[in-house]
Amino acid sequence: MRKTVIVAMSGGVDSSVVAYLLKKQGEYNVVGLFMKNWGEQDENGECTATKDFRDVERIAEQLSIPYYTVSFSKEYKERVFSRFLREYANGYTPNPDVLCNREIKFDLLQKKVRELKGDFLATGHYCRGGADGTGLSRGIDPNKDQSYFLCGTPKDALSNVLFPLGGVYKTEVRRIAQEAGLATATKKDSTGICFIGKRPFKSFLEQFVADSPGDIIDFDTQQVVGRHEGAHYYTIGQRRGLNIGGMEKPCYVLSKNMEKNIVYIVRGEDHPLLYRQELLAKELNWFVPLQEPMICSAKVRYRSPDEKCSVYPLEDGTVKVIFDVPVKAVTPGQTVAFYQGDICLGGGVIEVPMIHQL
């Protein structure tokens, strides 16, 4: 008897190709499932989720597979969006994609999979592992690997997950979609945070977190060099949006004092204070047993390179990470993912002092 795989379909080309490949294999009963988390409207006033669902319908009809829809909008606001706002208001820079994977896609969606009597959940993530019992590994396409965004998802939650695109390059996915005549073959990839869309980040955030004007201070001279509309709008290492003129070198955000509402900057992209040799990580999730010390590499943001490091577990359940060489713009609230080669060991949330000491 063939087993049933529930494909998380977003209306994009990746999940469309996942459904196509699984149907073509002939080993599974393939069922599509569209998940609505946010009711964002596009520039024409049309809900983007409605447009995406229409694309899911078109693909499901092309492939002759049944499909369902489920709304997690309420839960998404409670478990992802509310925390996103709270963290930003407190000066942190959270990663909502990591939260969404842990709280929604591989928790609530998994419950829906069980309701539909599914044996497997398949997604369009560019990573490997899951149902093969190996935990989590990078996808082979280095430009699309998404293991970073899954590093906070418990191993058990991935135990029945199929990642058909983990061994495929994005260019090949497009080619497969075009040769199969899939309706989404030329659809643009979605980018950015789903609930922000194409709007400037500041104009979005100011709808929920009030402006709080304050000083921008040059950390080296301790002189006021500008004004800001709210320290929560800025993240460590940020260059754009400071609106500071008359400097010989570009300015970068060094740190923030949320109590005094001060943003500190330094001049020059290679200023030594922009680099840190160590960090603490909390809210940890491991795919392998933690050894002491663990010699590995770490990514402190999605597009950053791997940095060699040593990881030391602490008594309070956090870990201290010491890098072989200092790393630029380590940001509190962001996600750190740990690797040995292509294997993702786990991940956590970065905790570093927000204020540099004089």
Curated annotation (Swiss-Prot):
The record marks 125, 334 as: Interaction with tRNA. The active site is at residues 100, 194. GO terms for cellular component: cytoplasm. Residues 95-97 are annotated as: Interaction with target base in tRNA. GO terms for biological process: tRNA wobble position uridine thiolation. Its EC number is 2.8.1.13. Pfam families: tRNA_Me_trans, tRNA_Me_trans_C, tRNA_Me_trans_M. GO terms for molecular function: ATP binding; tRNA binding; tRNA-uridine 2-sulfurtransferase activity. Keywords: ATP-binding, Cytoplasm, Disulfide bond, Nucleotide-binding, RNA-binding, Transferase, tRNA processing, tRNA-binding. The keyword ATP-binding applies. Disulfide bonds join 100-194. Residues 144-146, 301-302 are annotated as: Interaction with tRNA. ATP binds at residues 8-15, 35, 124. It is an enzyme of class 2 (transferase). It is found in: Cytoplasm. CDD domains: MnmA_TRMU-like. It catalyses: S-sulfanyl-L-cysteinyl-[protein] + uridine(34) in tRNA + AH2 + ATP = 2-thiouridine(34) in tRNA + L-cysteinyl-[protein] + A + AMP + diphosphate + H(+). Its main location: cytoplasm. Catalyzes the 2-thiolation of uridine at the wobble position (U34) of tRNA, leading to the formation of s(2)U34. Belongs to the MnmA/TRMU family. This is tRNA-specific 2-thiouridylase MnmA. The lineage of its organism: Bacteria, Pseudomonadati, Chlamydiota, Chlamydiia, Chlamydiales. The gene is mnmA.
